[in-house]
Regions:
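N-terminal presequence-like segments and the immediate start of the first folded domain
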Residues: 1-81, 87-139
Length: 139
């Protein structure tokens, strides 16, 4: 397959390590559609989430990572049309509501895209408590 046959352009934010086996986001060629891969609460440059990192902190970092990837694709938070969040413990997510709400306000303000939240048994990093993926339409 030649590069011209690929139906998307991969996105890598400045200063981020290229992931193995996936792209942080893709922009579909011929469209303004951006698909953002699941982002966990790991700071860019870290290899793992530090043990004991709480759900609110992980949510803030994961959501910030989604926005960083979106900006690298040429978008802004208000271009998000959908988010999907996977959490390992809904009760812990609910208990962290104030921290999550504050992170949302700081990161997305009053923008509320369509959203799904589901509990899963585990995520790629054993310390991960949340993974957020998104979709955006650029103007």
């Amino acid at each position: 397959m030649s590069p011209s046959d690929i139906a998307y352009t991969a996105v890598l934010p400045d200063g981020w390590t290229r992931p193995r086996g996936f792209s942080h986001a893709v922009v579909a060629k011929g469209t303004k559609s951006v698909r953002i891969a699941g982002q966990i609460g790991r700071e860019p440059g870290q290899s793992h989430i530090p043990p004991g990192t709480d759900a609110g902190t992980q949510w803030r970092v994961a959501l910030s990572n989604v926005v960083t990837v979106l900006k690298a694709a040429g978008g802004e938070p208000q271009h998000l049309v959908a988010l999907r969040a996977y959490v390992t413990d809904i009760a812990e997510f609910n208990a962290a509501g104030a921290a999550i709400g504050a992170a949302w306000g700081t990161t997305l303000g009053k923008h509320f895209p369509a959203m799904t939240l589901v509990q899963v048994s585990a995520l790629i990093d054993p310390q991960a408590k949340v993974e957020i993926e998104g979709e955006a339409i650029l103007p």
